[in-house]
Regions:
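C-terminal output helix
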Residues: 20, 38-47
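His/Asp/Glu-rich, glycine-adjacent segments
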Residues: 56-133, 137-140, 179-186, 193-310
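The C-terminal output helix
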Residues: 20, 48-61
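Alpha4 helix (beta4-alpha4-beta5 surface) of REC/receiver domains from two-component response regulators
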Residues: 3, 16-32
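Beta-strand elements within well-structured catalytic alpha/beta cores of enzymes
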Residues: 158-177, 207, 281-284, 324, ...
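His-Asp phosphorelay/catalytic-motif detector in bacterial-type signaling
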Residues: 4-9
Length: 362
């Protein structure tokens, strides 16, 4: 049957409970396996699961979001803490992905709620950001705190760490690729707040230095590149990591690699065995950031990623078919804790405004 029409779901009904037959059935991509005696409800459930599954999931998801819509709206209005906003964001990301395949169009409803959340969150950040900068002891986890509060405690505990930063990688994109790693890893997720501006030259330098940009400029002027300079703004990341390790009086051995293309990714895969003697290995993956810029500048990519769902799909395809997944596979089982994070995300602009001025205008 599969040879003639591989898309037809096949349900096997048998008396046999032999494991070898079960394995053979699973290996031949059987849709379901029922052992006699079988009651009518079992048959009905199997048919529904294989024939009407997508319709049932779509209907259930739509009803679920309609019920949750009001609760999320109340949560947006009542959010007073950084943890509250993290929960709002996680819920919106969850429903955005769940509604992706819904046959009932709910995207406008979700987009409206995301806009409402963005407006309220902007006011929240405006009200609290200065306090976060002036009082680091009471602020949420932010870019300069990642190494101090997440990486160093693991290293101090005797763990070895791979710190993999995927540039411009959003939570919804992480959720899109997470299942590809489930076979090799268990997960402990948490969110953090990027500094402002969230642009790479500020946010990522802040992560690797453990400092705010102004502090980097004052303490290490030779490692800071001004906004109006033609020089690359993220060329000193390895030295910044070194300064942070020395500032906290650690003696960890570390490596740093930035992957721009598949050729360098292959090179990195080849030297993984030589990296295993380091206590800390830092890897920056740039593809997602390149993809986000191409979505603006390249017509073909713009067509391929014209919706957020399509953008996530492209991210998954890259993760699965590039050397990135292979990198995670090779690290797995080598005694390393792996931290996957990002420096910032991206927002798809629906109503652009053209601003004309000198390139140094802020």
């Amino acid at each position: 049957i599969k040879a003639i029409n591989p898309d037809v779901p096949v349900v096997m009904v048998t008396k046999s409970e032999e494991e070898s037959i079960m394995n053979q059935a699973i290996g031949n991509k059987i849709a379901d396996y029922l052992i006699k005696p079988v009651n009518p409800n079992q048959l009905l459930l199997s048919i529904k699961k294989n024939v009407h599954k997508n319709v049932i999931i779509s209907e259930t998801t739509t009803v679920g979001y309609q019920q949750e819509f009001g609760r999320i709206g109340m949560q947006i209005n009542d959010s007073l803490t950084t943890d509250d906003w993290m929960e709002v964001y996680k819920k919106l990301v969850y429903w955005e992905i769940e509604l992706e395949n819904s046959q009932v169009p709910m995207t406008d409803m979700l987009r409206m709620q995301k806009q409402e959340a963005n407006n309220a969150f902007g006011k929240f950040v405006k009200k609290n950001y200065v306090d976060w900068i002036q009082h680091p002891e009471i602020r949420p986890l932010m870019s300069p705190d990642l190494f101090k509060k997440k990486v160093f405690p693991m290293l101090d505990n005797g763990d070895k760490v791979f710190f993999i930063l995927i540039d411009n990688f959003r939570l919804d994109q992480w959720r899109e690729v997470k299942d590809l790693l489930a076979e090799y890893y268990t997960f402990d997720e948490s969110l953090y707040y990027s500094i402002l501006p969230t642009a790479t030259q500020y946010a990522r330098n802040s992560i690797f230095s453990g400092l705010m940009p102004l502090q980097i400029e004052k303490m290490f002027p030779e490692l800071w590149v001004d906004e109006d300079s033609e020089e690359g703004k993220n060329l000193n990341e390895a030295p910044l990591i070194q300064t942070q390790i020395e500032r906290f009086r650690k003696k960890y051995t570390f490596s740093y690699h930035k992957v721009h293309d598949s050729q360098y990714n292959d090179k990195l895969l080849n030297i993984v065995p030589s990296l295993l003697h380091n206590q800390l290995n830092v890897v920056v993956l740039n593809f997602v950031d390149m993809l986000s810029h191409a979505r603006t500048e390249n017509k073909m990519i713009r067509e391929l990623a014209q919706s957020e769902a399509a953008y996530r799909s492209l991210t998954r395809s890259w993760f699965q078919h590039s050397g990135t997944l292979e990198l995670f596979k090779r690290i797995a089982g080598k005694g390393y804790k792996v931290i996957v994070t990002t420096d910032h995300g991206t927002i798809r602009v629906d109503n652009p405004e053209k601003v004309i001025g000198d390139k140094n205008t802020n």
